[in-house]
């Protein structure tokens, strides 16, 4: 299992870090088998696997449930679990209680929290031994305000992002996710920080990349962002399901190959 120190060492050696967002036991098992460095259990699970209209409906209990499943599937991978909307920002005491519950009950390596405004939370969580990954740029929990659009696209916004990135590192963040920002800005931020910077829609100048399992494998998703590359096509599973339906209806399945050979009814009838 990678440690924070090893991830920082990868950055220093300019070895790119791979991260995949996964939500359950079988996907986590595949991600670990592939040798991916990190797994993010994102609150995007609300839409991707729970069918919610947005991440607003995702609860702390949801994140714990899925975080546990991912840890069971990937016991030797660095796992980061999202703090869902509403878990940070109520009061420092409640925020830390939520963070501790999530961290302890999922056995994650770190939790992730969004936004530049959570710097005090990062400081306090770090002080009590909870590693925090920060998330800047496009923060999904704020799309109701910001919308799904490129962030840091003006001089002022870019300068603010650079400042915010430095602040979350100074507060104690162990890594930073940058989403949907210009490539050159992401590269500049990565150069200025000592912690690993993982990009999603932020170009190749970051220390690593993260994509969602379902997006990159075309598994049950209808709309993919510009920055998503498809590496395999799991949608072919529909063809298998159609064939199954046809064979059940025609009687072709189950054939003798998939049937137990043991005969029992003669014995049953002989007892009558």
UniProtKB/Swiss-Prot annotation:
GO MF term (any one): 3-methyl-2-oxobutanoate hydroxymethyltransferase activity
Gene Ontology annotations for the cellular component aspect, listed alphabetically: cytoplasm
InterPro entries from the UniProt entry: Pantoate_hydroxy_MeTrfase, Pyrv/PenolPyrv_kinase-like_dom, Pyrv_kinase-like_dom_sf
Pfam families: Pantoate_transf (PF02548)
Reactions catalysed, as given in the entry: 3-methyl-2-oxobutanoate + (6R)-5,10-methylene-5,6,7,8-tetrahydrofolate + H2O = 2-dehydropantoate + (6S)-5,6,7,8-tetrahydrofolate
Main location per the UniProt record: cytoplasm
Cofactor: Mg(2+)
Any one GO biological process: pantothenate biosynthetic process
Binding site for Mg(2+): 43, 82, 114
Family recorded in the similarity comment: Belongs to the PanB family.
Oligomeric form and interacting partners: Homodecamer; pentamer of dimers.
PANTHER family tied to this protein: 3-METHYL-2-OXOBUTANOATE HYDROXYMETHYLTRANSFERASE (PTHR20881:SF0)
The name this protein goes by in its record: 3-methyl-2-oxobutanoate hydroxymethyltransferase
Protein species of origin: Staphylococcus aureus (strain Newman)
Gene responsible for this protein: panB
């Amino acid at each position: 299992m990678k440690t924070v120190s090893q991830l920082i060492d990868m950055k220093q050696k300019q070895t790119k870090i791979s991260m995949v967002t996964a939500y359950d036991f079988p996907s986590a098992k595949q991600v670990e088998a592939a040798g991916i460095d990190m797994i993010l259990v994102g609150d995007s699970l609300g839409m991707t696997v729970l069918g919610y209209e947005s991440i607003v409906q995702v609860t702390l209990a949801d994140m714990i449930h899925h975080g546990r499943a991912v840890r069971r599937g990937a016991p030797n991978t660095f796992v980061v679990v999202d703090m869902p909307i509403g878990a940070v920002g109520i009061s420092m005491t409640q925020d830390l209680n939520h963070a501790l519950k999530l961290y302890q009950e999922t056995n994650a390596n770190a939790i992730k929290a969004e936004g530049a405004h959570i710097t005090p939370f990062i400081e306090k969580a770090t002080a009590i031994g909870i590693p925090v990954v920060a998330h800047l740029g496009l923060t999904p929990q704020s799309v109701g305000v910001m919308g799904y659009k490129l962030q840091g696209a003006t001089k002022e916004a870019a300068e603010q992002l650079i400042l915010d990135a430095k602040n979350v590192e100074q507060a104690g963040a162990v890594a930073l996710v940058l989403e949907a920002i210009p490539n050159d800005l992401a590269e500049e931020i990565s150069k200025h920080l000592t912690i690993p910077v993982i990009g999603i829609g932020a170009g190749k100048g970051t220390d690593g990349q993260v994509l969602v399992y379902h997006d990159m494998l075309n598994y049950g998703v209808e709309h993919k962002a510009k920055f998503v590359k498809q590496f395999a096509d799991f949608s072919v599973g529909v063809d298998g399901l159609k064939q199954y339906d046809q064979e059940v209806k025609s009687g072709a399945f189950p054939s003798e190959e998939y049937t137990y050979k043991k005969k029992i009814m003669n014995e049953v009838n002989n007892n009558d």
